[in-house]
């Protein structure tokens, strides 16, 4: 679904066919659609920036509510969160995250974009960051709890 993978839709990677790549896109879009259209009061879906082929396959697609960078939640220049990796959130009945970090982004590492090709590159690029995860749990956990109370009253 993400921009970084769109190139595989015109030239498949080794050991894959274009048909397989388009089928995987359809499966990913179907999963996103099922989550996005779920009948739940509060919802957050995380994904990188999407390409146009994904957007046109997602039922009731809407633009993401917010995009953030891990460094916006970092407090230590040498810490694991001081990196550049744009992450988008599609949300329902949840507020945008408030940035909790103290850094300005000028020292943020771009190790994700510069990761050398390797068998583990996918793991490096899939990493999620602890300060961002903590902000999600804290801020959205409180908001979802309040929403749940309002819906049951």
Identify what each model region corresponds to.
Residues 1-153:
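Conserved active-site and SAM-binding loop architecture
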């Amino acid at each position: 679904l993400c921009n970084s993978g769109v190139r595989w839709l015109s030239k498949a990677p080794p050991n894959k066919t274009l048909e397989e790549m388009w089928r995987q896109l359809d499966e990913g879009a179907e999963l996103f659609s099922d989550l996005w259209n779920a009948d739940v009061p509060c919802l957050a879906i995380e994904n990188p920036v999407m390409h146009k082929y994904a957007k046109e396959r997602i039922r009731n697609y809407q633009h993401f509510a917010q995009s953030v960078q891990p460094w916006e939640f970092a407090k230590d220049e040498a810490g694991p969160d001081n990196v550049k990796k744009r992450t988008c959130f599609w949300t329902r009945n949840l507020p945008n995250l408030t940035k909790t970090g103290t850094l300005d982004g000028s020292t943020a590492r771009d190790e994700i974009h510069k990761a050398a090709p390797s068998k583990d590159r996918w793991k490096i690029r899939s990493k999620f960051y602890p300060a961002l995860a903590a902000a999600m749990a804290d801020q959205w956990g409180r908001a979802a709890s309040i929403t749940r109370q309002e819906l049951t009253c």
